[in-house]
């Protein structure tokens, strides 16, 4: 009985990990990028990012300016997800490409 319970838990964790990675790959109008440079201009944060899916050293470079308070996770070298709502508003969130499993 214990083996069946352990097997069920391990299987559900594995499936949850796979579904999380699947959803991260298909996130709509966005892309993954690596932060190359960050600078505050008043209350706006200007980020220079490379659209490289956080995997390659090459890719197009984009400068993004957002109104954002200080966030210690948006540092140079961090992998971020940039979402665009097609109206000029962009949302930046950190993304960890390493799977915890």
UniProtKB/Swiss-Prot annotation:
Cystine residue pairs = none
Q: Where is the lipid attached (N-palmitoyl cysteine)?
A: 18
Q: Which domain of life is it from?
A: Bacteria
Principal location: membrane
Q: Where is the lipid attached (S-diacylglycerol cysteine)?
A: 18
Membrane association type: Lipid-anchor
Q: Which residues form a coiled coil?
A: none
For this UniProt record, the keywords arranged alphabetically read as follows: Cell membrane, Lipoprotein, Membrane, Palmitate, Signal
- Compartment(s) of residence: Cell membrane
* Signal peptide interval: 1-17
Where is it found, in Gene Ontology cellular component terms?
Answer: plasma membrane
Protein name, as recorded: Uncharacterized lipoprotein PM0553
* Organism of origin: Pasteurella multocida (strain Pm70)
């Amino acid at each position: 009985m214990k083996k069946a319970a352990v097997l069920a838990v391990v299987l559900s964790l594995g499936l949850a990990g796979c579904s999380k990675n699947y959803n991260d790959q298909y996130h709509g109008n966005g892309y993954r990028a690596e932060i190359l440079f960050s600078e505050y201009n008043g209350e706006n944060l200007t980020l220079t990012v490379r659209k490289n899916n956080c995997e390659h050293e090459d890719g197009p470079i984009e400068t993004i300016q957002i109104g954002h308070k200080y966030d210690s996770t948006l540092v140079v070298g961090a992998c971020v997800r940039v979402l665009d709502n097609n109206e000029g508003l962009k949302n930046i969130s950190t993304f960890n490409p390493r799977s915890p499993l």
